[in-house]
């Protein structure tokens, strides 16, 4: 082997080693420089859930402006909330998270469909979902299906409804009910979860129907990732009631509400204006005193103090579950134990100046029985959280919502909030996309790699 060839090989090896060392160095710099996107400040005091956001320490903590996006980009009723303001604090034993978002039309007096299902006297908006099909969708009634019954504009007909949109046909299940409005718009009543998935995949889901007297409750949710590593997906699957469900001749691979992040699980705190608000005027569940009635809830405990709460949910790659033994919204995660779990996460809420203000409060530590389904929150650990908001009066409900596009990092910090901030705290805007430091480091790494490749090409071409 000539000296010239040996020199080329030596230079090539050295350049590769140099390139790898640069990449690893940049990766370490990226990790070292990345700070939490949401800081949970150490404070003295407790939450005042009767007037959320009124505790003195909140005025010392700046808002974090979190961008939200449509969960269903093609639906005009999805992604109606463009940003969410968030503050967070802890006092040594509890964590407090304060949220505020604009809501031009609050959904007062709308039932949570699940809660209405356990209360025989429920009446008013929100009792069930109605889907508005995409404009241009038509239907036909196939009368050769003599064992099918369809309801069209309140009239029972023998036959099967078949929807058609841009040449795509979708046969409807037995007992489907539709209303055809004067402009040709088709409304689908009492939509089962699998049907919603089919409509979505065929481009026929336009949104949930609302009018001045029919709408859905407002909601806000925080998702806490429980898996290992850094999650890359914060969305949930649209599908059947359970994985592998056979519905009308179709098999649904995923359950609706199951976590899309492979191998992961998450705890969700869900506040619902029509179920967990603790407002006897505008929350029909509290107006009906449901959470003090064990015969209705199927629980062996009641809402102590009748305070507001957030529904604790648990999702994994299999399904969505409710962290209690009754299963009002979803299948219960356990058949016994979990005493008090449904009301473990406290909330306070108010509507003022065109915005919702909702405060979540939860003990940092959770009982042993809860631990597989809820996080213990400690200093020194990074948590990954995601946020969602529903504007029910405008048609958002279930999987139609405004969400963060990815998880955000959250940490408890031991320093108190700065004393220089005031009640008009500055707003820090963050996007749930790639953090800036990571983005810069990635760009630098790509440039270095390209330069190294050019040098290698020149050396070996000679």
Curated annotation (Swiss-Prot):
Signal peptide limits: none
Stretches in topological domain Cytoplasmic = 1-8, 457-462
* GO CC annotation: plasma membrane
Cofactor(s) the protein needs: heme
For side Extracellular, which residue ranges?
Answer: 27-431
Which residues are glycosylated according to the annotation?
28, 65, 91, 121, 144, 164, 174, 183, 211, 278-279, 293, 316, 339, 353, 376
Q: Any note on cofactor binding?
A: Binds 1 heme group per subunit.
- An annotated Gene Ontology molecular function: metal ion binding
Superkingdom of origin organism? Archaea
> Where would you say this protein principally sits, based on its record?
membrane
Q: Which gene encodes it?
A: cbsA
**What does the record say about PTM?**
N-glycosylated on at least seven Asn residues by identical hexasaccharide units composed of Man, GlcNAc, Glc and 6-deoxy-6-sulfoglucose residues in the molar ration of 2:2:1:1. O-glycosylated on probably as many as 35 positions by single Man residues.
**What role does it play?**
Monoheme cytochrome whose physiological function is not yet clear.
Protein's membrane topology = Multi-pass membrane protein
Write the protein's name: Cytochrome b558/566 subunit A
- InterPro entries to which the protein is assigned, alphabetical: Cyt-c552/DMSO_Rdtase_haem-bd, Cyt_b558/566_suA
Spell out the subcellular localization from the entry: Cell membrane
Q: Where are the transmembrane segments?
A: 9-26, 432-456
Keywords, in A-Z order: Cell membrane, Electron transport, Glycoprotein, Heme, Iron, Membrane, Metal-binding, Transmembrane, Transmembrane helix, Transport
Which Gene Ontology BP terms does the record give?
electron transport chain
């Amino acid at each position: 082997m000539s000296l010239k060839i040996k020199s080329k090989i030596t230079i090539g090896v050295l350049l590769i080693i140099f390139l790898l060392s640069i990449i690893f160095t940049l990766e370490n710099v990226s990790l070292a420089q990345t700070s939490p996107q949401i800081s949970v400040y150490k404070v003295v005091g407790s939450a005042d859930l009767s007037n959320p956001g009124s505790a003195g320490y909140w005025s010392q903590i700046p808002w974090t402006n979190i961008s939200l996006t449509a969960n269903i980009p093609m639906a005009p009723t999805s992604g109606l909330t463009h940003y969410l303001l968030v503050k967070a604090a802890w006092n040594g034993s509890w964590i407090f998270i304060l949220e505020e978002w604009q809501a031009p039309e609050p959904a007062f007096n709308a039932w949570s469909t699940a809660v209405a299902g356990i209360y025989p006297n429920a009446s008013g908006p929100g009792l069930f979902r109605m889907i508005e099909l995409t404009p241009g969708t038509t239907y036909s009634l196939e009368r050769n299906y003599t064992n099918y019954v369809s309801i069209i504009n309140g009239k029972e007909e023998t036959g099967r409804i078949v929807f058609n949109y841009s040449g795509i046909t979708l046969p409807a299940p037995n007992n489907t009910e539709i209303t055809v409005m004067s402009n040709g718009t088709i409304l689908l009543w009492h939509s089962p979860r699998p049907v919603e998935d089919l409509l979505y995949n065929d481009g026929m889901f336009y949104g949930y129907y609302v009018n001045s007297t029919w709408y859905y409750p407002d909601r806000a949710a925080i998702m806490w990732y429980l898996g290992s590593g850094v999650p890359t997906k914060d969305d949930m699957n649209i599908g059947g009631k359970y994985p592998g469900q056979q519905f009308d001749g179709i098999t649904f691979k995923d359950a609706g509400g199951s976590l899309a992040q492979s191998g992961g699980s998450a705890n969700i705190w869900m506040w619902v204006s029509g179920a967990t608000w603790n407002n006897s005027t505008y929350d029909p569940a509290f107006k009906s005193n449901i959470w003090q009635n064990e015969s209705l809830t199927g629980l062996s405990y009641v809402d102590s103090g009748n305070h507001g709460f957030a529904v604790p949910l648990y999702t994994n790659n299999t399904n969505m579950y409710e962290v209690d033994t009754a299963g009002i919204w979803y299948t219960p995660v356990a058949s016994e134990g979990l005493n008090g779990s449904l009301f473990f996460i406290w909330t306070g809420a108010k509507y003022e100046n065109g915005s919702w203000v909702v405060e979540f409060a939860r003990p940092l530590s959770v009982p042993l029985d809860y631990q597989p389904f809820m996080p213990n929150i400690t200093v020194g650990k990074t948590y990954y959280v995601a946020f969602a908001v529903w504007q029910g009066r405008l048609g958002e409900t279930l999987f139609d919502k405004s969400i963060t596009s990815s998880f955000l990092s959250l940490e408890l910090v031991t320093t108190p909030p700065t004393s220089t901030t005031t009640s008009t705290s500055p707003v820090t805007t963050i996007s749930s996309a790639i953090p800036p430091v990571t983005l810069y480091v990635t760009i630098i790494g790509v440039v270095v790699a390209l330069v190294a490749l050019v040098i290698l090409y020149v050396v070996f071409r000679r």
